[in-house]
Amino acid sequence: KLKTIDYDAIVIFTPHWQTYIGTHFLGLPEFKSKSVDPVFPNLFRYNYDLKVDVELAEAMHEETAKAGIITKMMRNPDFRVDYGTITSCHLLNPSWDKPIVTISSNRNSHYYSNEVMIEQAKALGEACMRAIEKSGKKVVLVSSHSLSHRHFVTEAPLPEDMSREHIYNHSQYVWDMKIIDMFRQGQMQEVVDIMPEYTEQTIAETEAGGLIWMMAAMGVPSYPAEIYGYQSVIGTGNCIACWDPNTETRELVL
């Protein structure tokens, strides 16, 4: 899909860069290091060398601050970029020929509630939208997280045991199917409305605010999403979906 459209940068909101005081943006032109997954160090080790659109990141930082949200630019050259950013950007654009902007997830749901998280994520998304519009750049927005997030807590004797390749339980699956059906119907405002209950019932990674941020930054789409797939990862539910605002390039993908 991305090979068929013209864009200047990828803007990604990641739940795996968790900040507890404000929202942070990568703020140096380049980050280069080795990422080792803190959960599965035996499975994920990645040498990255990524470029950041600092101008756009600073514009988002400024607009976010104007909205009353505490913000900070990450300018530590030794900062380890999170694996959510790395895996999502690599799978979407393995050539890494576009600059990125990475946004941290401020953990309001931990301090307060899912409702507070939603309001903050909305304000952040709207601020980012204003910054993008003022910049005149074309960007791809990425929300990197699972849907339902209950997962197995013991490892099978055979690491790739296919009998364990399923959603944790049926209630998680039913919730995910409900959300995906609403994606297909273009009912994104309704998704936003039920997000607190969905997040609580499924322990979803939506609790970081990524999906709400993206919907707010897109003006809450009312058109259908392109659904590319749904699959389990150690019991969690994962959906690949795309909201294309261009009616000429939007496809019916079920």
Each predicted region: which residue ranges?
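Short, internal active-site loops enriched in acidic
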Residues: 15-18, 145-150, 156
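Beta-strand elements within well-structured catalytic alpha/beta cores of enzymes
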Residues: 8-14, 103, 137-147
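Flexible, D/E/H-enriched segments
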Residues: 1-8, 20-123, 154-254
